[in-house]
């Protein structure tokens, strides 16, 4: 379980921060919506760099990162020491990221293109909330997974 989670977004995920905050509020998880100056472009690498400072300072122990696909945020977060970020578009993927990899960050893509259909796919507010709630309430399994996480930490 997390003590405090930072919710951040680039320009494409900005409108969904309140959806995530509401999901956390419903299950009594403390959160912060940090302010940061990443310039007019609000590029996701700058957002990740900014929120990582809060994590390093111990002010938060979890991150929820929102952007168009979620992929850029995930890549950026996984470059930060101590962060294990799962990209999830279903509650099951979010849960497995916690159970197997002890992920402390969740990247969500709020809208992206489906390569099969070519149509823009958006996660519903309800689905975002379910993914978030599943992520923060799922425990790490430990055991053999702890050994694997330690190996990841030492890469």
Protein language model annotation of sequence segments:
Residues 3:
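Nucleotide donor/acceptor-binding cores
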Residues 6-15, 91-155:
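C-terminal binding/interaction regions
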Residues 8, 32-35, 63-67:
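Short, conserved beta-strand edge motifs with alternating hydrophobic and charged residues
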Residues 15-26:
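Short, solvent-exposed amphipathic alpha-helices that sit
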Residues 30-42:
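A short beta-strand-loop structural module common to alpha/beta enzyme folds
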Residues 40-53:
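Helix-loop module immediately N-terminal to the HCX5R catalytic loop
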Residues 50-87:
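Helix-adjacent hinge/juxtasegments
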């Amino acid at each position: 379980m997390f003590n405090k989670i930072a919710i951040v977004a680039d320009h494409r995920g900005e409108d969904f921060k309140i959806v995530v905050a509401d999901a956390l509020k419903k299950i009594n998880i403390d959160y912060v919506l940090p302010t940061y100056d990443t310039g007019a472009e609000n590029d996701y690498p700058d957002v990740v760099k900014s929120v990582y400072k809060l994590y390093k300072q111990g002010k938060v122990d979890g991150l929820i990162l929102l952007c168009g696909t979620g992929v850029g945020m995930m890549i950026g977060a996984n470059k930060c020491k101590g962060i294990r970020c799962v990209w999830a578009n279903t509650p099951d993927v979010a849960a497995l990221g916690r159970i197997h990899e002890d992920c402390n960050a969740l990247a969500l893509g709020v809208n992206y293109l489906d390569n099969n259909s070519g149509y823009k796919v958006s996660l519903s507010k309800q689905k975002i909330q379910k993914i978030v709630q599943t992520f923060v309430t799922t425990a790490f399994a430990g055991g053999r997974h702890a050994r694997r996480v330690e190996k990841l930490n030492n890469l």
